[in-house]
Amino acid sequence: MRIQTERFGVLDVPDEAVIRFPQGIPGFPQEKAFVLLPCAEADAFAFLQSIMTPPLAFLLVTPFAFFPDYNAPIHIEQVRHIGIDENNLGEIWTIVTVPDNYHDMTTNLLAPLVINRKKGEAAQVVLEKTNYTTKHRLYPASASTEANGKGGG
């Protein structure tokens, strides 16, 4: 399949690489088909590119690269419809927000994406009874301050 993207131009994507979100993504219910594109600069990052909407691409991160103790209490019932079970736990990614200063990037640990590549389906799951929020910093605040030239010294 050939898709047009704003960020990456025209891409040839094998049909088996398409990841479907049967229930859409909150805020984007009409967007149900994406492709996961690795970020060449950093293994922990990838882009989730919409098949239908060329400008729509989410930056994702594997949360364990920045939060090794991340424990997403996902109930199998929340993701069974995409083929996740005790024998196939899938992959966990989180959506990143990138402000003007990339040192201020945050990720949404409260609502991870669970991807079942074997089945080509995924879901965004909102965690319950957790202290995670939608805005966890990827880099310490001191990195942002130094990048802006406001560090003490």
Swiss-Prot record:
InterPro entries: Flagellar_assembly_factor_FliW (IPR003775), Flagellar_assmbl_FliW_dom_sf (IPR024046). It is found in: Cytoplasm. Its main location: cytoplasm. It comes from the Bacteria. Coiled coil: none annotated. One of its GO terms (biological process) is regulation of translation. Keywords: Bacterial flagellum biogenesis, Chaperone, Cytoplasm, Translation regulation. One of its GO terms (cellular component) is cytoplasm. PANTHER family: FLAGELLAR ASSEMBLY FACTOR FLIW. Acts as an anti-CsrA protein, binds CsrA and prevents it from repressing translation of its target genes, one of which is flagellin. Binds to flagellin and participates in the assembly of the flagellum. Belongs to the FliW family. Interacts with translational regulator CsrA and flagellin(s). This is Flagellar assembly factor FliW. The gene is fliW.
